[in-house]
UniProtKB/Swiss-Prot annotation:
This is RNA-binding protein Hfq. RNA chaperone that binds small regulatory RNA (sRNAs) and mRNAs to facilitate mRNA translational regulation in response to envelope stress, environmental stress and changes in metabolite concentrations. Also binds with high specificity to tRNAs. Homohexamer. The gene is hfq. Pfam families: Hfq. It comes from Cupriavidus metallidurans (strain ATCC 43123 / DSM 2839 / NBRC 102507 / CH34) (Ralstonia metallidurans). Residues 10-69 form the Sm domain.
Length: 79
């Protein structure tokens, strides 16, 4: 994955994680998962509800926060 993709993903997911914002994650097959983001890396998101699930990013279609989240994107490398 390119660094440009990480410029949006990482700050967004990190804000959701730090602020303990409940999220709905829709997978490409239509399944809806709900919980809080516990952790993430380049390939997976750990989603905590009654159990912790490892969700591969390539299977994720959409991440919908339960409320608005402010996050900062470092756009100094943008042209």
């Amino acid at each position: 994955m390119s660094n440009k993709g990480q410029l949006l993903q990482d700050p967004f997911l990190n804000a959701l994680r730090k602020e303990h914002v409940p999220v709905s994650i829709y997978l490409v097959n239509g399944i809806k998962l709900q919980g809080n983001i516990e952790s993430f890396d380049q390939y997976v998101v750990l989603l905590r509800n009654t159990v912790t699930q490892m969700v591969y990013k390539h299977a994720i279609s959409t991440v919908v926060p339960a409320r608005a989240v402010n996050f900062r994107v470092d756009d100094s490398s943008e042209s």
